[in-house]
C-alpha cells in the first residue's frame, strides 16, 4: 500500500467521525437536559454500564464525572450477572451504553433496573431496540457510518464519548462546580500545578523559620 493512501485513509476516518458528531449535535434535545438534571441531583452514585468498546467509553465518562463532582463508577455488563448487580442500588442512577441496544449481556441489567425501580438512562443508536424502549430517559445517538469496512466501532464510539463529555461539562455548570472545586479532586499532575495559588505554596506563621544574626550556624 502506498503511503499516500494511508494519509487518505486517516482523513477519511476523521471525516466520518466529524459527520457523526454533526449529526449528534443536531440531535440534542430535552432528554439531554433531563439527564443532566438526574446526574446533578443524584443523591448516590451515577453508574455506567456497557460491553466491549462501549464499556471502555463508559469508564472514561464515569471517570470524568467523578472528577467534576458527581460520584460515579463503571461496571461491565458481562460481570453483572456474576454478582456485580449488587453494586447497583435503588438510589443510584444507571446509564447503559450500547450502539445496537440489543447486546445480550445488557438485558439482565435492564431487567434488574426495572424490577428494582432504578432510573435507567439509555445511550443508544437503535430506536427499535430493547434498551431504547426500556429506558426511562432515551439519549439517542444518530446512526453513522463506521470506518474499517463499516464494521469497526469508530464513529459510534466517538459520538458516545462526545455525548459523555457534554453531559459532564453541562453537569459542572448545573452545579456551579468551579476550578477550586476541581482542584480538590485533582491534587496531582500538571492540571493541579496550574490551579495552585500562592497561598497553597506559601509558608507562614510558626512554620516560617527565622534566624537572628547571633544564631549558631
PLM ranges: what are they?
Residues 1-13, 51-59, 193:
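Short, compositionally biased "basic patch" segments
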Amino acid at each position: 500500500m502506498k503511503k499516500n493512501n494511508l494519509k487518505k485513509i486517516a482523513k477519511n476516518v476523521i471525516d466520518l467521525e466529524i459527520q457523526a458528531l454533526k449529526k449528534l449535535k443536531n440531535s440534542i434535545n430535552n432528554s439531554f437536559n433531563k439527564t443532566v438534571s438526574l446526574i446533578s441531583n443524584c443523591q448516590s452514585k451515577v453508574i455506567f454500564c456497557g460491553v466491549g468498546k462501549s464499556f471502555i467509553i463508559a469508564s472514561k465518562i464515569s471517570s470524568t464525572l467523578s472528577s467534576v463532582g458527581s460520584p460515579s463508577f463503571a461496571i461491565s455488563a458481562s460481570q453483572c450477572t456474576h454478582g456485580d448487580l449488587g453494586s447497583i442500588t435503588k438510589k443510584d442512577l444507571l446509564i447503559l451504553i450500547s450502539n445496537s441496544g440489543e447486546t445480550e449481556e445488557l438485558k439482565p441489567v435492564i431487567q434488574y433496573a426495572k424490577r428494582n425501580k432504578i432510573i435507567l438512562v439509555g445511550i443508544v443508536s437503535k430506536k427499535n431496540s430493547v434498551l431504547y424502549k426500556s429506558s426511562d430517559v432515551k439519549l439517542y445517538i444518530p446512526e453513522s457510518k463506521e470506518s474499517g469496512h463499516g464494521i469497526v466501532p469508530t464513529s459510534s464510539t466517538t459520538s458516545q464519548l462526545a455525548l459523555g463529555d457534554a453531559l459532564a461539562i453541562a453537569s459542572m455548570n448545573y452545579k456551579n462546580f468551579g476550578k477550586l472545586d476541581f482542584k480538590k479532586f485533582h491534587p496531582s499532575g500538571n492540571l493541579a500545578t496550574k490551579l495552585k495559588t500562592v497561598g497553597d505554596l506559601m509558608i507562614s506563621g510558626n512554620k516560617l523559620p527565622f534566624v537572628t544574626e547571633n544564631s549558631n550556624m
